Amino acid sequence: MENVVIVDAVRTPMGRSKGGAFRQVRAEDLSAHLMRAVLSRNPSLDAAEIDDIYWGCVQQTLEQGFNIARNASLLAEIPHSVPAVTVNRLCGSSMQALHDAARAIMVGDAHVSLIGGVEHMGHVPMNHGVDFHPGLSRSVAKAAGMMGLTAEMLAKMHNISRQMQDEFAARSHQRAHAATLAGYFKNEIIPTTGHDADGVLTRYDFDEVIRPETTVASLAALRPAFDPVNGTVTAGTSSALSDGASAMLLMSESRAKALGLKARARIRSMAVVGCDPSIMGYGPVPASKLALKRAGLSVQDIDLFELNEAFAAQSLPCIKDLGLLDSIDDKINLNGGAIALGHPLGCSGSRISTTLLNNMERRDVQFGLATMCIGLGQGIATVFERV
């Protein structure tokens, strides 16, 4: 099988969904902007050579509907001969796009793929038009469709206290702010035009969502968001609502060499698993274990992890059961995570993979693992190896 390599990985800044920087920018434009950026950064690649475009998006309606992958590629003026498909595995959509493209390359059906994802949660809210089948309640708890309550369940099962959650969430904002000041995001963020609070066109090259003033004390003052009486999960310990897109350029190792393009990493293994919807946030544990097994590696072999922070209450049980509690500050989400940066659903999989690759290069390490929980009980993981 062909080795699959990552040639490039970029993202937009993350904008606040409520009246944020991208309130007047459509999801297709965020996507097309990145598609154009990837091509301009890799001039030796003729856009007509792209075999397929895989683009993650969850709420595929309104501006995100009718195959946003194709709409965005047309906006980006990619040749009409290049096909495009929109992928939906809820929170794991753009990582699933990565997996789909990688498999096509592995078996020789493709040599070049552009992947990524987008979600404009300000324009198309997460629960827009959702209508669960009433028959689901025969086999699945009704609360399993409410992500915050699944996080509450995990917190209770794993004895994750409110204090632990507040500390983890504060760390996310502090790390993300420190990474911004240090310029660690510069290599992955493509400056993107939006509007400031006064409506003036502004070029954003930083994440608007991060709240550097966040402290454990300020988080402790927040009320539980999902279980007002007995709950511990607050808005402050949940992933922020944000708008954004991310993209990666995948190639067979042979094609990258032929084009004179430097491979940043290869995909070592991939995995997707299912789990009980009531504890959907636990999905990264079995997914990571399966991906590691397929890679012939152990948790100890992995130098850096990116775990999508849907909630502090679900991240901490995953970290605990992967045996990484003592390694958080050395190995996990070094630049913060979704609690600070937000979780634009269709964007996050390739966003965390992009951040992981940059951290692997900055720290000069060999192996990295990106993993996410997925609504309704799934987990997805990818192991990367630098080349």
Swiss-Prot record:
Pathway the protein contributes to: Lipid metabolism; fatty acid beta-oxidation
Q: Any idea which residues are catalytic in this one?
A: C91, H343, C373
Q: Where in the cell is it found?
A: Cytoplasm
GO BP annotations listed:
fatty acid beta-oxidation; phenylacetate catabolic process
Q: What are the alphabetically sorted keywords of the record?
A: Acyltransferase, Cytoplasm, Fatty acid metabolism, Lipid degradation, Lipid metabolism, Transferase
One Pfam family, please name it.
Answer: Thiolase_C
Catalytic activity as recorded in UniProt: an acyl-CoA + acetyl-CoA = a 3-oxoacyl-CoA + CoA
One GO CC annotation, please?
cytoplasm
Q: PROSITE patterns attached here?
A: THIOLASE_1, THIOLASE_2, THIOLASE_3
What's the EC number here?
2.3.1.16
Q: Can you provide one Gene Ontology molecular function annotated for this UniProt record?
A: acetyl-CoA C-acyltransferase activity
Q: What is its main location?
A: cytoplasm
The family database entries (Gene3D superfamilies) matched by this protein are listed as: 3.40.47.10
The record's comment on protein family reads:
Belongs to the thiolase-like superfamily. Thiolase family.
The record's subunit annotation is: Heterotetramer of two alpha chains (FadB) and two beta chains (FadA).
Extract the PANTHER family matched here: 3-KETOACYL-COA THIOLASE FADA (PTHR43853:SF11), 3-KETOACYL-COA THIOLASE, PEROXISOMAL (PTHR43853)
What is this protein for, i.e. what is its function? Catalyzes the final step of fatty acid oxidation in which acetyl-CoA is released and the CoA ester of a fatty acid two carbons shorter is formed.
Q: What is this protein called?
A: 3-ketoacyl-CoA thiolase
The organism encoding this protein is: Serratia proteamaculans (strain 568)
